[in-house]
Amino acid sequence: VQTNFVLGLDSDAGEEPFELTKRFVDKTPGAFPGYSLLTAFGEAAPLNLEYQREGRVLSFPFPFLNNHLAMNLKPKNYEWIDFYDKVIDLTEYTFSKKAIWRRFIANKGTTPKWMNFMRAVSQEGHGRIRFYKQVRKNLLEDASFRNYFEGQSKQLPSFYINIIKEDLGAWWQWFPKEAIEHNAYAYLHKKETSTILSVA
């Protein structure tokens, strides 16, 4: 069984959402928690219009809109460092040796036991912890990186460009460079234009 959680919702504030999620991990050891960072997907949700009106949507290109590589929405009730501190703490708690062992013995059958174990010790568990720690480090030490996260710059940090390069390998040379840039407010502009046209 996998249980899915979205971190960074506008209703979240303080320690409570993260601490209560830890209690869930304790109370349901057989479940595999899947954590997603809140992501605004274009026109998929009308709520995205509100986010765009508030100027909170970031211009992360499509390769990073996978719920964990980037959160393309500035949190409403957290500063970035504080948010990543809490995400890292929760993820470390969820994929600690103790939690992995409890999940292993709570599940019946060889396949779910070992599948959950491998997910925990590979990219989905320990891999994400390493990644989130690097993002936090960049937020602290790299002003241009932080400016992008604060919406003060639209220049995608080289950290993320290098991820795309690594993923594409030899195909990077054919990747259209304009695809790195993305209008995060296209939905809002489209709505405003259609409203003006309908009034006219």
Question: PLM features: what roles do these ranges have?
Answer:
Residues 125-200:
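C-terminal non-catalytic accessory extensions
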Residues 120-123:
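A cross-kingdom feature marking charged/low-complexity
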Residues 1-116, 139-140, 197:
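A structural motif corresponding to the C-terminal lobe/cap of the Radical SAM core domain
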